[in-house]
Amino acid sequence: MGETATLVLLRHGESEWNSLNLFTGWVDVGLTDKGRAEAVRSGELLAEQGLLPDVLYTSLLRRAITTAHLALDAADRLWIPVRRSWRLNERHYGALQGLDKAETKARYGEEQFMAWRRSYDTPPPPIERGSTYSQDADPRYADIGGGPLTECLADVVVRFLPYFTDVIVPDLRSGKTVLIVAHGNSLRALVKHLDQMSDDDVVGLNIPTGIPLRYDLDARLRPLVPGGTYLDPEAAAAGAAAVASQGGG
């Protein structure tokens, strides 16, 4: 790599369950019309600022895959290599998947709700195998035994960072502009690593949907601008506030 490397992070556009305020996790829901528009706009922002990715990384979930496709189309970069991995998936919300966030908060109380939703190392109760929103029979995850039954953010860090270091970093060091289209919590895990955030500080980090976040990294892959730079700062601030109010996921 030269003196700097460029990494762009993008959370998928608004999903159907974001709109309904449901815990989503590994449940494979699509984008809303608003989410599709956010994805297109994110690609337009990349093109307008000359920030053209050479390679794309995304998860195995359609809301991220669709966002990536729409963004690359808008940026005229559909032809670049695409690499998908379950390690970029959203945090698995266990037995909370499919539940209404407001109803869950009312049932279990503010303290327990916040511990499950935002703490670094407290996972929700595990999902029951074979239940409606479990993934144990999903062929995407056959080689990992159906995937986790629940996760906290610390678990996402453990599964994502080795992939980042072993697979994505070589592309950065070779001089490629890398675009990662993923999810609120998988991106929070990566931002925690990039910005060397404490376990306590990352609790308050919210990633808005559909707005590219640019990181220029030095030779040690440390950000030249801590926290990176959103390509639409005003929309990002409003979006992060909206995520904080509903819990993300």
UniProtKB/Swiss-Prot annotation:
Similarity field: Belongs to the phosphoglycerate mutase family. BPG-dependent PGAM subfamily.
Lineage: Bacteria, Bacillati, Actinomycetota, Actinomycetes, Mycobacteriales
Disordered: annotated segments: 119-138
Keywords on record: Gluconeogenesis, Glycolysis, Isomerase
HAMAP family for this protein: PGAM_GpmA
Organism: Mycobacterium avium (strain 104)
UniProt protein name: 2,3-bisphosphoglycerate-dependent phosphoglycerate mutase
Active site per UniProt: H12 (tele-phosphohistidine intermediate), E90 (proton donor/acceptor)
Function description: Catalyzes the interconversion of 2-phosphoglycerate and 3-phosphoglycerate.
Catalytic activity line of the entry: (2R)-2-phosphoglycerate = (2R)-3-phosphoglycerate
Gene3D superfamilies: Phosphoglycerate mutase-like (3.40.50.1240)
Site (Transition state stabilizer): H183
SMART domains named in the record: PGAM
Residues reported to bind substrate: 11-18, 24-25, 63, 90-93, 101, 117-118, 184-185
Enzyme class: isomerase
GO biological process assignments: gluconeogenesis; glycolytic process
Source taxon at top rank: Bacteria
CDD domains linked to this entry: HP_PGM_like (cd07067)
